[in-house]
């Protein structure tokens, strides 16, 4: 393994911009690493080596001509979750229904990455249409956890997290609907942030649940993640949910936090996200992390968010309802797979045959749940009630932030389980979102930072840090301070 793949993105950027190393060298080193290990891990669905090297060469040429770097991360390659559209690579969402589909336009996030001079190594594996917590729901096979290849890497963005953890990429982009950036980060000992809803454009992000989906940055350090956050965030008039507000100073906050002083910061431990039903090693790691925050000068208090108890059932009504609506567009008429189009079937039959063949079991399950929840006789009883709970959860957050600056919890109640262990028990798998989904329901930012290895099985555990809307910088200050005090993960 080239030592170029072990350096942080910040280190690589500094050395590329100083012309001590070239972007082509760095990109090639990561492509070599992909060729070496991804046959076993299956983190990538598509590798764009030639295009990535062309982008890297363009960065090197610009620097050689005396031009300033296009961004603080210019020349540092990246892995992109296969849910963002790209004109030069297939966008499949890990589904057979979009196998080989080429988008006619780039997502705004893709456009920002290209403008920043960031070579895109390829598109990463995921649960189909971002529905799942293990990356086992991909139509192209599961991704394996680099820490133990018999275990899951989290989901839905397990491909991006596994690529980071295995040194196949120094940076990655994910999406988070109910924890799909943070839970994979936790179980692979990487860093992932779900920004405030509406601060990273969803234009060109294939929708799962539109009121919950949020693209976000992933890295191996808090500073790397902050640098990428500033590249992809910002107002986009093409996204009707985009917020026209300044990007929080997350890089400055990360650098400040690394100094290790949290005096004056109030941290709330959420009572409802600390349960004896959680894995003992997860709780032990979390309690140790809270002790570190106290040692850094933070004031730690317990806070109660009583309606979090209803977060899981509320989420699993809101999200499938939006899925049912969004995925209606895959009708075999406009793009993607088309089955039975031989002139002997009606349009309705072609649509039914295509959806039956093209969608996997979990996607079908959520479409059915959502369609039922939205049906005329049950709308108020199910979907309407879930929206009321969503409002109550947001109010719980508001009351909590009157007392504290940030909230903390374990990222996931469990360490990564064995591949196949929960495939036939979706309810058990849904529980892995227990700690992460409240922030999606409220639209608030949250981050997962590695907090060590579980005493139960030696697998990675994550500390979740949450903040009020548009206070993403608080995540980075606290996360960087904790990261510096915690030291390396074994």
From Swiss-Prot:
Belongs to the amidase family. GatA subfamily. One of its GO terms (biological process) is translation. It is an enzyme of class 6 (ligase). The gene is gatA. InterPro entries: Amidase, Amidase_CS, Amidase_dom, AS_sf, GatA. Keywords: ATP-binding, Ligase, Nucleotide-binding, Protein biosynthesis. GO terms for cellular component: glutamyl-tRNA(Gln) amidotransferase complex. The lineage of its organism: Bacteria, Bacillati, Actinomycetota, Actinomycetes, Mycobacteriales. This is Glutamyl-tRNA(Gln) amidotransferase subunit A.
């Amino acid at each position: 393994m080239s030592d170029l793949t072990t350096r942080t993105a910040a280190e690589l950027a500094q050395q590329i911009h100083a012309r001590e190393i070239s972007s082509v060298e760095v990109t090639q080193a990561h492509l070599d690493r992909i060729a070496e290990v991804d046959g076993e891990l299956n983190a990538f669905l598509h590798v764009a080596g030639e295009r990535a090297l062309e982008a890297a060469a363009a960065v090197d040429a610009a620097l050689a001509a005396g031009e300033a770097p296009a961004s603080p991360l210019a020349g540092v390659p990246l892995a992109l979750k296969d849910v963002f559209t790209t004109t030069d690579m297939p966008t499949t969402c890990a589904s057979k229904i979009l196998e080989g589909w080429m988008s006619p336009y780039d997502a705004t996030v893709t456009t920002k990455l290209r403008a920043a001079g960031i070579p895109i190594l390829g598109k990463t594996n995921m649960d189909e249409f971002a529905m799942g917590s293990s990356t086992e729901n991909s139509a192209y096979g599961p991704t394996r956890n680099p820490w133990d290849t018999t275990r899951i890497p989290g989901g839905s963005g397990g491909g991006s997290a596994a690529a980071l953890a295995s040194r196949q990429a120094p940076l990655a982009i994910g999406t988070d609907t109910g924890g799909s950036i943070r839970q994979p980060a936790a179980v692979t000992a990487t860093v992932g942030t779900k920004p405030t809803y509406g601060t990273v454009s969803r234009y060109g992000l294939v929708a799962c649940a539109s009121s919950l989906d949020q693209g976000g940055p992933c890295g191996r350090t808090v500073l790397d993640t902050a640098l990428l956050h500033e590249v992809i965030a910002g107002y986009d008039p093409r996204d009707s949910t985009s917020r026209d507000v300044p990007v929080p100073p997350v890089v400055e906050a990360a650098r400040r936090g690394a100094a290790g002083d949290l005096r004056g910061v109030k941290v709330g431990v959420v009572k409802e996200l600390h349960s004896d039903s959680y894995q003992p090693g997860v709780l032990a790691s979390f309690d140790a992390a809270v002790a570190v925050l106290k040692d850094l000068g933070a004031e730690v208090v317990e806070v109660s968010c009583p309606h979090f108890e209803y977060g899981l059932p509320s989420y699993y009504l809101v999200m499938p309802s939006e899925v049912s609506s969004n995925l209606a567009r895959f009708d075999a008429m406009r793009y993607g797979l088309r089955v039975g189009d031989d002139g002997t079937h009606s349009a309705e039959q072609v649509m039914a045959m295509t959806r039956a063949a093209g969608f996997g079991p979990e996607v079908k399950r959520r479409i059915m749940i959502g369609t039922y929840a939205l049906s005329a006789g049950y709308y108020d009883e199910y979907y309407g009630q879930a929206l009321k709970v969503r409002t109550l959860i947001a109010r719980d957050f508001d009351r909590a932030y009157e007392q504290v600056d940030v909230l903390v919890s374990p990222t996931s109640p469990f360490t990564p389980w064995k591949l196949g262990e929960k495939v036939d028990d979706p309810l058990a798998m849904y529980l892995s979102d227990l700690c992460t989904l409240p922030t999606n329901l409220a639209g608030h930012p949250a981050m997962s930072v590695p907090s060590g290895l579980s005493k139960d099985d030696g697998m990675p555990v994550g500390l979740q840090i949450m903040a009020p809307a548009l206070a993403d910088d608080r995540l980075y200050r606290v996360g960087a301070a904790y990261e510096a005090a915690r030291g390396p993960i074994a």
